[in-house]
Amino acid sequence: MTTKYNEIYQSSINNPEKFWQEISEDIFWFKKPTKVLNKFNPPFYKWFEDGVTNTCYNALDYNIEQGRGEKTALIYDSPITGNKAKFTYKELRHKVSKFAGALDNQGIKKGDRVIIYMPMVPEAVIAMLACGRIGAIHSVVFGGFASNELASRIDDSKAKILITASCGFEPGKTVEYRPLVDGALKLAKHKIEKIIFFQRKGYEIKLNSPKEISWNEVLSNSKDMDCVEMKSNEFAYILYTSGTTGVPKGIVRDIGGHIVALKWTMKNIYNIDADDVWWSASDIGWIVGHSYIVYAPLFKGCTTVLFEGKPVGTPDAGVFWRIISDYKIKSLFTAPTAFRAIKKEDPEGKFFSKYDLSSFESLFLAGERADPDTIKWAENLLNVPVIDHWWQTETSWAISANCTGIEMQKTKYGSACKAVPGYDVKVMKPDQSLTKPNEMGDIVVKLPLPPGTFSTLWNADERYKKTYMSNYESYYQTYDAGHIDEDGYIWVMSRTDDIINVAGHRLSTGAIEEVLSEHQSVAECAVFGIADKLKGQLPIGLIALKAGVQKDNETISKECIQMVRDKVGPVAAFKTAIVVKRLPKTRSGKILRGTVRKIADNEEYKMPATIDDPTILDEIKQDLIKNNISKV
């Protein structure tokens, strides 16, 4: 029987040009494209090559033309500061247009790069959209990132202006941006021409040089700016991904394909219409923030929420429920780690019962693999579909998902459901042959990738080809490992460098983590491989417990080891499960398994630029030493 999903998916694969041409009719073009896809120079494919449009026009002006000017575009809620604000589409356009005029006054023209190093405040969104309005290319850097990381982005992008703030806030602490910015400017070889500081109330700083200007001052004599016409294949933004060494990779997003694909996803993947309120609990410094706090919801014309807070500690594990209740949110998109944190602090869901969540219809998880136990916990608590889906900074939207706006598929716990229309996903062996159903391998996507995905790296075409497009001919290598089952469900088990080899058996750390997370006392866990003379590698488990657990650590460890032996088998040689206070993560919630492995193997490692709290690594090192895993 042909289902609606199968019909749409097959049409996207069998005739992608017709499929995307029809979808492209749904956005605003100054000049509609006559060519859908240029494939004459693979892997540098170009979508809607001769089309002319504008990112900001589609996000704001087009919605106002459609009669949505008085509708709320952006809700800001900061439990850290207590500040709240709402902006209609007209109000947001006015602020964006004025700031675009301010950038124009500072000499910013089409194609110039602008770095945005900001906390989660409305001014950050305004700056992003203002860049799009005048054709500048923004590069958002996570607010509070280390000076050397900011400097590398300044040097690679050759940005003219840096837009920043006096500070950011984390639970219980203020992060001053001035020392970080000053440090970056000293390290950077490229010289920034101007720095615009947004002064946070009560945390104003003194401006030290003629290069520095306050947000309010730069707006004082600015004029409104209209949107400039942009070719479809010009760039909307650069978003850098951190490598462990060398120059970070600058992912670039072309304008036309970005608008077409992201607007389509809001209804087809997330079932969001223009009348709905949508919340993506991420940060604008990450791809989820770019795509699903700012661009996709505004392209769709719905209401989007900008949240300056954390899932726990601002003030408690009920803040997510308060936001959903206050703003009548239909769907939430966040990382699995957010729900693990809530589950750890409030395993019984006591905070949940205090709020009215009658508007809430679905929860979407992505960022790293969602273990089945967390999904089931959330399902039981929320009584709505909880959907794990999979995508990457490089793609900007989901590769596999349960497309709720097309047709709900049956849930298979541990799978990110089926390929999204547009993505021809395969699993391959290193010899370039296809795997059998349920056989582990490298997950790849047939070229050309759909619109909205990255078309190259900033000033690094050869690096783009070599890194992503050369290992599997005519395929994009995702660097994720997993399998596809007999029903077409995609199981993303781990990054390819998280596959461990135990006595010749290739095992996924994700498969072992899935078992550990089923233990009733375990809130979250991480598995990594250490070097072993006899077996090559051995898996080690780190487990963090739920709040209020009474059972002793030794008993829990023994039970976890037995569970892995029972469910994965003796082949895993899993003999060590260490209870730790907390796990080392990036600010976006990814667990730093590779860094922990290096600590365990006494290898040199670089402090990850994205680490949430560097002190955790010392805690982990001491735990490993106590358990005879690492030597001083």
Where are these regions (language model features)?
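Conserved AMP-binding/adenylate-forming core of the ANL superfamily
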Residues: 56, 74-129, 146, 150-151, ...
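Conserved pre-ATP/AMP-binding loop-to-beta segment of ANL
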Residues: 70-72, 195-198, 208-240, 247, ...
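Structural core segment of the AMP-binding/adenylate-forming
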Residues: 129, 133-217, 336
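AMP-binding/adenylate-forming catalytic core of the ANL superfamily
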Residues: 141-166, 181, 325, 332, ...
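AMP-binding/adenylate-forming catalytic domain of the ANL superfamily
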Residues: 193-199, 534-537, 566-591, 603-629
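Gly/Ser/Thr-rich phosphate-binding loop
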Residues: 302, 330-334, 343-410, 424, ...
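Conserved ATP/PPi-binding loop(s) of AMP-dependent carboxylate-activating enzymes
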Residues: 418-422, 433-468, 507, 604-605
